[in-house]
Amino acid sequence: MFTLKKSMLLLFFLGTISLSLCEEERNADEDDGEKEVKRGIFALIKTAAKFVGKNLLRQAGKAGLEHLACKANNQC
């Protein structure tokens, strides 16, 4: 009975160690994945901001030129 308890305790101990090592490795893999996702989201936001900024400036430029042309021709 005593040797059975020792064997079971040893198996439990080894199983706990291997489980903790697997969890550490999995957590390390998950951390790397989060960094990649964050980079991907940042790049997407950056690209969208550039696109919106260019379009807004282009529209503002057109509106400004139309307004100046209107004032120059006294058609406003």
Curated annotation (Swiss-Prot):
UniProt tissue specificity: Expressed by the skin glands.
InterPro entries given in the database record: Frog_antimicrobial_propeptide (IPR004275)
Keyword Secreted assigned: yes
Signal peptide: 1-22
UniProt subcellular location: Secreted
Propeptide: 23-37
Reported function: Antimicrobial peptide.
Protein known as: Esculentin-2MT3
Source species: Amolops mantzorum (Sichuan torrent frog)
Lineage of the species this protein comes from: Eukaryota, Metazoa, Chordata, Craniata, Vertebrata
